[in-house]
Amino acid sequence: DVLYRTILMPGFDQPFVEYHNFGAYMDTVFGEHINRDGWVTINFIPTAAHTIWGCLAGKLLVSDKTPVQKVKYLALFGVIALAIGFGPDWTHITPIIKRIATSSFTFASEGWVLLLLALLYWLIDLKKFNKYAWIAAVVGMNSIFIYYFFNTAGYQWFNGAVAIFIKGLFGMAGITPKIL
């Protein structure tokens, strides 16, 4: 966020406006074009935090702490990350923008992930509700294939099959495809 607020180039001087921010400027430097979907290359820096936090969560899960302590730590850090992420967004300091990976987005998304991890760890490892855990194991063992499948042929097939239900459901709620 500091770079977005301090490095203001002509035409790229609006920190959180799509196509007119530091990330868009850096895309023109790196590849001489701006991504039409608003994604920026420079967001690899803040999103590296997700990898680091994932490693720390993994270290916690394999530590000597009791399972209850692990759930408490995951939930506590999840709530703290949510507060750090949503606080600046709610006070209009830094908006949550996924495509440029603002600090608010990075913390808010990590908070949700840690809370979900705490819930799943509690359900599967503590309460032994693992009847359907094999599905997650299969997906985890084939994650690269699943990623590529849903970004190529699966994207067209899955979106077409699911769109009938999702568009109607979200349409009734007033959520447009642009928001999704």
Model-found features: residue ranges?
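Alpha-helical transmembrane segments and their immediate juxtamembrane cytosolic regions
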Residues: 1-180
